[in-house]
Each structure stands twice: as structure tokens, then as C-alpha cells.
């Protein structure tokens, strides 16, 4: 079963699984890495990169057959694609659709860029970041991962 969407792009629907839509252009492969999806997986994965968005501009999109995302996976995706939407598909129909939300505090997900931070030493301390107007700030050493940096490099 294949359907064409208005701009001429043909994308196969999935029977059951998850669609991650409105991913920041160029971050689709980062989303796959966050989800641990690698070459050789036996799961059907569809990636559309830099396609026109109904909201205007461009987007990436990922479809994953027979998998529903966990909350911590959605939280990680929100860091690289804050405007993304997650749709749960059941029997070819959208069962649940909701936007991702960037958590106010991110614990144990982001690696601090400061090599001297207590979270990067041999101490058993999880990283802890808070959302800052210019990016994400480490609560231990005050290092900033700015909006200009690629947050995907620190996940």
C-alpha cells in the first residue's frame, strides 16, 4: 500500500508503529542514532530527509514499524527536534498524536562538554542540565551547550 502526498512524494504508510514528523531538517539520522537504530536492523524504518513541510519550510520524518517510543526516547528527540510531533499508528490509523516537549531539566542524557566536570570524572554522578534561553546549562560546572552547537553530539 503506497499513497502519494500532495507535493508528489510517495511514502509508504505503516500498519503499526511510530511516525516522528516535523524533525528539524538534517536531524533525522540523529533521531535514528538516539533510538539505537543501526544498519542491519530487522525493523522497517523509513526516513525522509529535507522534504517540504505543510507548516512551511523543510523537515525530516522517520517512520518505525512495530515500535512505540518510551518517554525518555521522546525526551531525547525533543532536544534535537523541539518542533517534532509523535504519532502512534495502529492498524494504519493515527491512534495518538502529540508534540514533543523539551523537559525543563535533563538528567543523565546529555554529556557535559567540560572534561573537568564532576559528571565526566570517575565519580558516580549523572549529568544534570537545565534549559537556558541560549541552550542547556550544566548544573554542576555551569558549562553551556549553546543553541549554535549540535546537541546531538552530546547525547
Swiss-Prot record:
GO terms for biological process: 'de novo' pyrimidine nucleobase biosynthetic process; pyrimidine nucleotide biosynthetic process. Zn(2+) binds at residues 112, 117, 138, 141. GO terms for cellular component: aspartate carbamoyltransferase complex. Its cofactor is Zn(2+). Binds 1 zinc ion per subunit. SUPFAM superfamilies: Aspartate carbamoyltransferase, Regulatory-chain, C-terminal domain, Aspartate carbamoyltransferase, Regulatory-chain, N-terminal domain. One of its GO terms (molecular function) is metal ion binding. Keywords: Metal-binding, Pyrimidine biosynthesis, Zinc. Involved in allosteric regulation of aspartate carbamoyltransferase. Contains catalytic and regulatory chains. PANTHER family: ASPARTATE CARBAMOYLTRANSFERASE REGULATORY CHAIN (PTHR35805:SF1). Belongs to the PyrI family. This is Aspartate carbamoyltransferase regulatory chain. It comes from Methanocorpusculum labreanum (strain ATCC 43576 / DSM 4855 / Z). The gene is pyrI.
Amino acid at each position: 500500500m503506497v499513497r502519494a502526498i500532495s507535493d508528489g512524494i510517495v511514502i509508504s504508510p505503516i500498519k503499526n508503529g511510530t511516525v516522528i514528523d516535523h524533525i528539524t531538517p538534517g536531524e533525522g539520522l540523529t533521531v535514528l542514532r538516539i533510538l539505537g537504530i543501526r544498519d542491519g536492523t530487522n525493523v522497517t524504518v523509513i526516513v525522509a530527509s529535507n522534504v517540504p513541510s505543510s507548516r512551511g519550510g523543510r523537515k525530516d520524518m522517520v517512520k518505525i514499524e512495530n515500535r512505540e517510543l518510551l518517554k525518555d526516547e521522546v525526551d531525547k528527540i525533543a532536544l534535537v527536534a523541539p518542533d517534532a510531533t509523535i504519532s502512534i499508528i495502529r492498524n494504519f490509523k493515527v491512534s495518538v498524536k502529540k508534540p514533543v516537549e523539551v523537559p525543563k531539566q535533563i538528567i543523565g542524557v546529555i554529556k557535559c562538554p567540560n572534561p573537568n566536570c564532576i559528571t565526566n570524572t570517575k565519580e558516580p554522578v549523572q549529568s544534570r542540565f537545565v534549559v537556558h534561553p541560549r541552550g542547556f546549562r550544566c548544573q554542576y560546572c555551569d558549562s553551556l551547550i549553546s543553541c549554535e552547537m549540535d546537541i546531538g553530539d552530546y547525547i
